Amino acid sequence: MIRSIAEPPVRIRSMGHDDLPMVSDIERRSYEFPWSHGVFRDCLLAGYQCIVLERNNRVAGYGILSIAAGEAHILNLCVDPNYRSHGYGEQLLDAILLQARSAKVREVFLEVRPSNLTALALYRKKGFHKVARRPAYYQASEGRKEDAAVLAKKLISYDR
């Protein structure tokens, strides 16, 4: 008899101040030039849409969305390196896009490193397309800089 092994349930919820140590830890393990704990705290204090994805009651990823004037900007989307390749990034992105739609956002923007092929593939799959390039946007190793690809996705048009 073949048994099916079920994946542990995941839950997406609002990020709270108690999540910041785990979020900061994931950020440090994911990026060479990570956001500081204070940047995450400031995002919460500013009222940005901050969410976490939990697996087995442990934060496995997070996303941060800024909304203003009918536009949204995905500021950060990250999955713990130990939990990648399970579709959690896509689940987080779907949740962020749902928040944007609920806020009647017309267009969502983000920056991504052109070297981050996994993220680029996910964003393209979800309908984002390149609209610009920001030269020398990201810090890179050995004092170098890396450009950012600016991606956008149109959501439903809302009448004013």
Features from the language model and the residues they span:
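Short helix-coil transition/hinge motifs at the ends and kinks of transmembrane helices
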Residues: 2-6, 140-143
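Short hydrophobic/aromatic beta-strand or adjacent loop that forms the aromatic wall/cage
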Residues: 48-50, 145-150
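Short amphipathic helical patch at the helix-1/turn junction of helix-turn-helix
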Residues: 79, 113-114
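Short glycine/proline-centered loop/turn elements that form peptide/ligand docking sites
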Residues: 93, 116-119, 136-142
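Conserved catalytic-core motifs of GNAT/GCN5-like acyltransferases
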Residues: 109-111, 124, 129-147
